[in-house]
Amino acid sequence: MQQFLRYNINVIKEDNDKNYGKYIVKPLEKGFGITLGNALRRVMLSHLPGSSVFALKIKGISHEFGFIPGVKEDVTQIILNIKNLVVWISDNMITDETLSETPIEKWPVMTIRANKAGIIKAGDIECPLGFEVFNKDLEICTLSEDAEVAIDIYATRGRGFKTAAENRSEIGSLSIIPIDSNFNPIIKVGYHVEEETSDVITDKLIIEVGTNGLIKSGDAIAIASKILSDHLKPLIDINKSLHDIQVLNEKNVEEKNKKLSIPIEQLDLTVRSYNCLKRHGIQTVEELVTRSKSEIENIRNLGKKSVREINKKLSELYDLKLKNN
């Protein structure tokens, strides 16, 4: 089997808490940028595990269309606010098996208890052991006067999206109000593909991921890749002899990376061409071959003759060339 290029993953940008990240994947065989980008995006948008509120219980309220005396917001608005809670549930302390076997009457409940005028925020929620609210500044409701508010909040783990109707079937209690659950920890994910030309035309995949804090952006890509990999493994097992075949060629990439990191001093250019490239900030072969012929021609004091010289040196020494216009 003809081998494919082995690619590298580099971080372009990450915020301090790593909930947002921009990553570059290259070099990919032409066409694989869209193939990988689309597959990863679809998995991240729909199939990553997370946690979410699925129901709540409000003292004195039996349905979502009621009002709490002394509270500015109606119950519908309170529910909309609570839907935005980012709830973390410890894997070590509370397993999926425990949650699936726990009846709603014994569920570990997060609580709001207030009786003074003011804004109630997510940071005011009392959490049981193994639960934590991440977005503590989220406003839940406003007490316009001294009034009693008692809210029990139920959260669990899951994947994707579940409607209130789906959650209702698992609750079985009229006093508990089911709500929609969005378990996906991804806020946004996008990608685009750029073409790169050196000795061959390759794809460069740029992926941008933002999360709600339950997962790091880099981990989101890793988990999505693991989900895809495990779904493909049974298909590979149709022909088990394929396990011994190396599909990605590591040597080619290592050699190419060495070529690209070579300083332009080693091209043995004329003094004029060398000085012009240096003044323009071009230090390595990679910075040179990612530019087109017209870009190099437009550098001050360079022209078509210099471009021919540079291309000749790249070809003779490293089997590389400038990008076509």
UniProtKB/Swiss-Prot annotation:
Gene3D superfamilies: 5' to 3' exonuclease, C-terminal subdomain, DNA-directed RNA polymerase, insert domain, RNA polymerase, RBP11-like subunit. GO terms for biological process: DNA-templated transcription. One of its GO terms (molecular function) is DNA-directed RNA polymerase activity. The keyword Glycoprotein does not apply. SMART domains: RPOLD. The keyword Ubl conjugation does not apply. GO terms for cellular component: cytoplasm; DNA-directed RNA polymerase complex. It is an enzyme of class 2 (transferase). It catalyses: RNA(n) + a ribonucleoside 5'-triphosphate = RNA(n+1) + diphosphate. Residues 1-239 are annotated as: Alpha N-terminal domain (alpha-NTD). Its EC number is 2.7.7.6. It holds the Pfam family RNA_pol_L. Residues 255-325 are annotated as: Alpha C-terminal domain (alpha-CTD). Belongs to the RNA polymerase alpha chain family. HAMAP family: RNApol_bact_RpoA. The N-terminal domain is essential for RNAP assembly and basal transcription, whereas the C-terminal domain is involved in interaction with transcriptional regulators and with upstream promoter elements. DNA-dependent RNA polymerase catalyzes the transcription of DNA into RNA using the four ribonucleoside triphosphates as substrates. Homodimer. The RNAP catalytic core consists of 2 alpha, 1 beta, 1 beta' and 1 omega subunit. When a sigma factor is associated with the core the holoenzyme is formed, which can initiate transcription. NCBIfam families: PRK05182.2-5, rpoA. This is DNA-directed RNA polymerase subunit alpha. It comes from Mycoplasmoides gallisepticum (strain R(low / passage 15 / clone 2)). The lineage of its organism: Bacteria, Bacillati, Mycoplasmatota, Mycoplasmoidales, Mycoplasmoidaceae.
